[in-house]
UniProtKB/Swiss-Prot annotation:
SUPFAM superfamilies: Glucocorticoid receptor-like (DNA-binding domain)
Family under the similarity heading: Belongs to the DNA gyrase inhibitor YacG family.
Annotated region (Disordered), positions in chain: 44-67
Organism: Cronobacter sakazakii (strain ATCC BAA-894) (Enterobacter sakazakii)
Protein name as it appears in the record: DNA gyrase inhibitor YacG
Free-text cofactor note: Binds 1 zinc ion.
GO molecular function: DNA topoisomerase type II (double strand cut, ATP-hydrolyzing) inhibitor activity; zinc ion binding
Binding site for Zn(2+): 10, 13, 29, 33
Gene designation: yacG
């Protein structure tokens, strides 16, 4: 009997990955691909789009929020 395993593509290299406990780095195919993705986020090569720019004058500054 065949299981209906969900298969996704690795976001880094595109290799097929079975979504399950046998794939500990899911959705990535390997630790290497996982670290490449993390590095891209850390280097700000990837980002979540926003509708506007935030600056320290928008009330997000840590200095303004301290007692």
């Amino acid at each position: 009997m065949m299981s209906d395993a969900t298969i996704v593509n690795c976001p880094t290299c595109g290799k097929e990955v079975i979504w399950g406990e046998k794939s500990p780095f899911r959705p990535f195919c390997s630790k290497r691909c996982q670290l490449i993705d993390l590095g891209e986020w850390a280097a700000e090569e990837k980002r979540i789009p926003s509708s506007g720019d935030r600056s320290d004058t928008d009330g997000w500054s840590e200095e303004e929020n301290q007692p």
